[in-house]
C-alpha cells in the first residue's frame, strides 16, 4: 500500500515540476549565453600550467644534481617527461591555432 502512495506522490511532484517548467518564460535571444571562462582565459591557464610543470621539473633536477636527500632519479625522470609531454602538447595546440588563423585569413570575403 505504501508503494502506491509513494508512486502517487512522485507523480504529483513530477506534474508540479512540469507546470513550473511550462510557466517559465523561454529565452528568445539569438546570442547564446556563455557560461564559464572564455577561450583566452583557458589558454592562459594551460600555458601557466605548462610553465609550472617545467619549473617544477627544473627544480627537481637541480635538487638531484646537488645531491639533496629525498630526491630520487625516477622522480626526476618522471617530472622531466611530464614537462616534455605537456610542452609538446602546447606546441601542437599552437600549431593548430596558427593553421586555423591562416585558413580563416585565406577565405574569400
UniProtKB/Swiss-Prot annotation:
Any single biological process term in GO: bacterial-type flagellum-dependent cell motility
This protein's record includes keyword Membrane: no
Name the record gives this protein: Flagellar hook-basal body complex protein FliE
Keywords, alphabetical: Bacterial flagellum
Gene coding for it: fliE
Lineage: superkingdom: Bacteria
Organism: Pseudomonas fluorescens (strain Pf0-1)
InterPro entries from the UniProt entry: FliE
Protein's UniProt keywords contain Endoplasmic reticulum: no
GO molecular function, one term: structural molecule activity
A cellular component annotation (GO) from this entry: bacterial-type flagellum basal body
Family affiliation: Belongs to the FliE family.
Cell compartments where the protein resides: Bacterial flagellum basal body
Pfam families with a match to the protein in the record: FliE
Amino acid at each position: 500500500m505504501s508503494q502506491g502512495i509513494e508512486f502517487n506522490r512522485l507523480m504529483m511532484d513530477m506534474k508540479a515540476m512540469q507546470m513550473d517548467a511550462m510557466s517559465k518564460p523561454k529565452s528568445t535571444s539569438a546570442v547564446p549565453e556563455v557560461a564559464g571562462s572564455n577561450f583566452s582565459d583557458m589558454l592562459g591557464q594551460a600555458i601557466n600550467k605548462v610553465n609550472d610543470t617545467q619549473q617544477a621539473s627544473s627544480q627537481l633536477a637541480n635538487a638531484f644534481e646537488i645531491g639533496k636527500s629525498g630526491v630520487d632519479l625516477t622522480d626526476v625522470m618522471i617530472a622531466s617527461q611530464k614537462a616534455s609531454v605537456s610542452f609538446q602538447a602546447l606546441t601542437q595546440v599552437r600549431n593548430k591555432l596558427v593553421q586555423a588563423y591562416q585558413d580563416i585569413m585565406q577565405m574569400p570575403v
